[in-house]
Each structure stands twice: as C-alpha cells, then as structure tokens.
Amino acid sequence: MDKWLKAELEKKIGAIKHMSLLDEQGGTSTVRKIVTSQGAFLLKSSSHQRYREWLRREALVLQKLTETHRLPVPVYYGFIQQQHSSHIVMSFEDGITLTSALRKAKGDTEKKKLIKSFGQFLNRLHETELVPDIQPEIDWLDLQIKRAGDYVEKGQAEGSAWLLKELDQHRPVPVQQTMIHGDCTTDNVLVKDGEVCLFIDAAGISAGDPRYDESLAIRNFATNEAFLNAFYEGYCRYRVSKQEFEYFNGGLYEFF
C-alpha cells in the first residue's frame, strides 16, 4: 500500500495497526481487513474501470443506508479515488458467506435451516419500505438493459448482443417494485450464529424487480426440491416460474 493511500485511510479510521487479505476474495475487487486504534474495518479496492464504477455505486448506497439505518449492511466510512484505483472503507462484520456456511454444514438438516433463514432474510428485504435517494431514475429493468448494452459494446459482458435483444423484446410481465439487493447470491449474504444476517456487495441495492433477487438466491439449488422447499418456507411473497427464473438467472445475469 502506498503512503498516500495509507495516510488517507488513517484520516478516516485511525492509525493502522494491522492489515491482512481476507481468505474469501471476490471476483471484482481485492478485500482486506484493517485493524486500527478505532476498531476493525474492511477495505475493498479495484483497478478495473468497470469494477471501479461498481465500487463508487456501492459507496453511494452504503452512505445513504448508513445515514438511514434502514437495511442490514456494513457501515460506510469513506470512498477514496486514485488515478488508477478506487477504494471503499466500511465496517468489518463478523460472519461467513452463506456459500461457505453451506459448504461447512454437517448435513442436509443444517443446510435446510440455513436456506430457510436466507428465504426469511430476503423476504424481509422485499417487504421493506422503499429507501429514498437510491431509487433508479428510470424503470429498473430499462436501466439493466441499458447497462447490459453498454457492457456488450465495451466487450465486458459474457452475454451476447443477440441474447440482450431477446431479453429486451420478451420481458416478463411487470410486478410491483420493491427494495432489492441486485446481486443476491449465496456469496453476498453473511451468516452468523446459524442465521443469515447481513447483505454485502451492496452496489445493486435499489428499488427493482424482486424476481431478480429471488432467481439469483435459488440458482445454486434450483434443482434440489428439498432445498428449494426450505427456501420457500422462509420466502413467502411469491414463487418465480421456470420462465421467470430463466429470464433473470440464465438471461439478464449473464451481463452482470
């Protein structure tokens, strides 16, 4: 870490005593735990332009949510930009990802308990009153299609231009928008004491289509009837159809 960045961090969170890379690293940024005289913090850093934009968006979302205390997310402490990299500082939260918790679970009974907790946690988010200032200026799906088109033009998406055209022309019937996470996979929620308790990677939090969250939430166990039933014991609002699941998980998510 260069001296300038270290100095900027210490202005926000106090003198740094220790810094270490986390065992679990995301695909879009480098994540470090920092211990200072004021406590434990998380530093996310990225040098890729697309992911720097996501970090900036996450900083704006966390800042608003820290001010309102409306959703279970890390506390925002600051955003730092350098010429070739961006950094966001937030509270370090105890817990492991649901992906890790499911991997470490001793049997299906424990896994089903975790998955039911995930369903309950997501259900609460989708029942939460919309948070001002982090709602998209246009329809959520219109915005995602537009962003996907930008990524295709820049060669930054796995999805093709043909797929995007299909998604644009064959949209699902609109539903009432709710607060959504926007990337609600098992990688992006934390588990503590056997319960899902916190959202991480908050860049996509806004008003949007709850079926997108639901589809990404079940993507890793969509063909396991017992696990799927456990999820819907907790998530009681709606059950996506096969066509809706394919649209959001097998289609739209290809671009993000």
Task: Locate the predicted segments by residue.
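ATP-binding glycine-rich phosphate-binding loop
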Residues: 13-36
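Short pocket-lining segment of the protein kinase catalytic domain that shapes the ATP-binding cleft
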Residues: 88-96
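Active-site acidic catalytic loop and adjacent metal/ATP-binding pocket
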Residues: 27-35, 42-43, 166-212
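Generic structural signal for small/hydrophobic residues in well-ordered secondary structure
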Residues: 31, 62, 76, 91, ...
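Protein kinase-like catalytic domain
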Residues: 66, 122-130, 222, 235-239
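A conserved alpha-helical element in kinase catalytic cores
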Residues: 42-88, 105-124
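An alpha-helical support segment within catalytic cores of ATP-dependent transferases
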Residues: 2-11, 104, 109-118, 123-182
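Active-site Asp-x-Gly
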Residues: 52, 178-179, 192-240, 246, ...
